[in-house]
Amino acid sequence: MDKQKRIQVISFQSLSANSGEGMARLGYYLSEQLHQRGLLNNFIVHSKGKFETPFPSKPVSIFSRYYLFLLNRLNKHLKIPSYKFRLLQEKLFDWFCQFRIQANTTHIFTTNAYLYRTFLKAKKSGITIILLPGTPEENYIYELVSEENKRLNITKVDAYTYRRRIDFFNKSVRLIDTVIGSLPPAYTSYSKAGYHPRVVKMLGHMKPDFKPIQLTQKEITETFTIGYLAHTVVLKGLQYLLEAWRILTNNANNKHMHLSIAGSIDETIKEYIDLHFKDLKQVTFTGPIKDAPAYMQSLDLFVVPSLIDGAPVTALEAAHYAVPVIITDHSGSGELLSRNESGCWVIPIRDAKAIADKIEWAYNHREETRQMGRNAKHNLDTYSMESFITEIADYLEHKA
């Protein structure tokens, strides 16, 4: 008789008041469905805090809440580089997680690939390992960022180019049986990676819990405001947006355009921007913002110029406020916004001219641009995240 299917769901993130942080949100809703189907062993998260779930769940360790607190306090004084601190947390999670694997488990579903010890123990027990990554394949990101660093003459190491972290990923990922590519950049990059695991295409998005709003018709004014919001590192591609902006502002016909750059900027890329774009006109660097909804509602257009980005939430937030989006073909959120009547323009990466052309078109076609924003909101509002979770649960129940 076949062993009864029992699934453990694993997320590196922690629980929140309503579900989970980051990709733990997907794990939470999937665990809920698997529990209803009688398939769930438990949901393992980094920390539960004071939160409980309507299904079996456990922190990776009874001490995790405390060691995370102590690590963060300690790091305030030691100032460990963020990429080393991240790897330390990942290895600690992996160490404790291996002891959470249950004897009757047949399948592990995880959104975290950095689990070498856990995966090794699972393989020795004949457990099938399924990964649904929230980001594209790490070696692909490494190559993109390394190429860009070379182009910009940047030598600083970060989480994407830290060799020890990449090596840990490579050891771990080769133990995985199946990768579910839910975002186009993830599916494409894992398919091309050359591993033996099967890569399954199952497109879907984690829809944020935006508060319902009543949109008012925004008056078309002379000024046309373009926005960008991110914690800017090299792969966010801000340098290409600024190159596009130089092209645009050299044309006197575009004198009523204004570019608003919001969010913190990593010191390395800031040095590059200060050196190469200090003479730009009609641009404001606002730094971190406290009121993202107000910021989005002040815009006529939003740009996501990322070299690679799994699912930029800012693009979906712009869509929530009916702001049309220019987004690269290496950013997963474009797949959702371009469904039906498209609410975005999808452009190639590293193409300043394409960015400039789309901004200029939007500037000269205001009403059509506003309709694109309404399309974006429609595509977001009518998208069913529940159907996506059900599709994953069906796959785990019947095909995994």
Locate each region found by the language model.
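Glycosyltransferase donor-sugar binding loop
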Residues: L229, Q239-L242, M257-E271
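A short, well-ordered alpha-helix in the C-terminal region of glycosyltransferases
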Residues: W361, E368-T382, D394
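Conserved acidic donor-binding segment of nucleotide-sugar-dependent glycosyltransferases
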Residues: R339-N340, C344-A352, W361-R366
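Short hydrophobic beta-strand element within catalytic cores of glycosyltransferases
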Residues: P324-T328
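Donor nucleotide-sugar binding/catalytic pocket of nucleotide-sugar-dependent glycosyltransferases
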Residues: K150-I213
